[in-house]
Amino acid sequence: MKKLPVSKYLQTMRYAAANYVSRECIYPFYASFKVTHVCSLKCSFCNVWREKTPDLVKEDVFNVIDNIANSSIVVLSLEGGDPLVRKDLGEILQYAHQKPFYLFFTTNGHLLHKRPMKEYGKHIDYLHISIDEGHDNLKFFDRLEEFQSYGPEICIQIVVTKETLPVLEEKVKRVYEVNARTVVMPACHLDGTDDFYPDPKDFRAEILRLKKKYLNTITTPKGFLDNINTPHGCSTSSVIIDSDGGLFYPCRTVGKHLYNFTEGSFMKFLKTPEAKEARTAMKECNRSCGWYQYFATDVFASPRSLYSSLSPYILK
């Protein structure tokens, strides 16, 4: 994992302090950028593949990345769809890796064997590979050692439904055996999909049990497990950027495209009355969708949750 400039860490602390003083998360620290909606799969719990949002050309992708680099964001995750479908992905990764943030990369893994992953890996800090029943790739658990050879630290992303919660342990055990990490998240109920969301209390209990049994393997923070069992556990400390550069704000569940990262400063947008009104709407939302990105990113504000998330990397 690369080291960021000291000035970036100091800047992040200032933004965190500003959030604390204002008692609202004005400045986010985590962003996922869906560089494409194209995907080879049609997961039953996902609605991204149903959307027809166009992808940006490479030059506009660079503009989005520049805007992110000049913001409070300290972690950028390139996602999709499956970003491996982009033919210009190598150039995008190389460009993003030069910027002052940690670069995550998430894929369903079905195209890994067709791409120069060891070359791509030089520009990725953390490689997330989604493996579960929904992604129809459970056989990939037999290839974890291969994935580790690409270079970056790998983290297996496991989406759990109410039906698959009882068989989660065998997946976690396999990740543990190869000294890798896994982030386990519930299949939140998205618009236009069937409801596969597991009981949040049962999910919390099982993850805590497995975290204790398979030490330093599951990165899902305890703060997330607590947040999905409270009425308002979500936060705007994380944002999702659509494949056309549009920002879902305050979240992708109930938000709208209020801003586009190809047009003007993101930091200026966050200070607008429109943005503040959206954050207020999030606080008043009673949906409790359990979307991992919005319910887990309090790790940036809570030292206890931060340790819960990072300790598998630090202690193992």
Task: Tell me what each language-model feature is.
Residues 39, 43-46, 234, 250-251, ...:
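Short cysteine clusters
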Residues 56, 99-102, 123-261, 301:
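Radical SAM enzyme [4Fe-4S]-AdoMet core and its adjacent flexible, acidic
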Residues 33, 37-40, 228, 279, ...:
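Processing junctions and N-termini across compartments
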Residues 52, 82, 133, 188, ...:
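Flexible, active-site-proximal loop/turn residues at the rims of small-molecule/cofactor binding pockets
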Residues 2-119, 123-126, 302, 312-316:
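Conserved alpha-helical substructure of the radical SAM core
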Residues 27, 248-316:
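Flexible mid-to-C-terminal extensions adjoining Fe-S/redox cofactors in radical SAM and related proteins
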Residues 45, 49-52, 201, 240, ...:
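Secreted/processed peptides and extracellular or luminal domains of membrane proteins
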Residues 19-22, 224-228, 276-278:
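Short, P/G- and charge-enriched loop/turn segments at secondary-structure junctions
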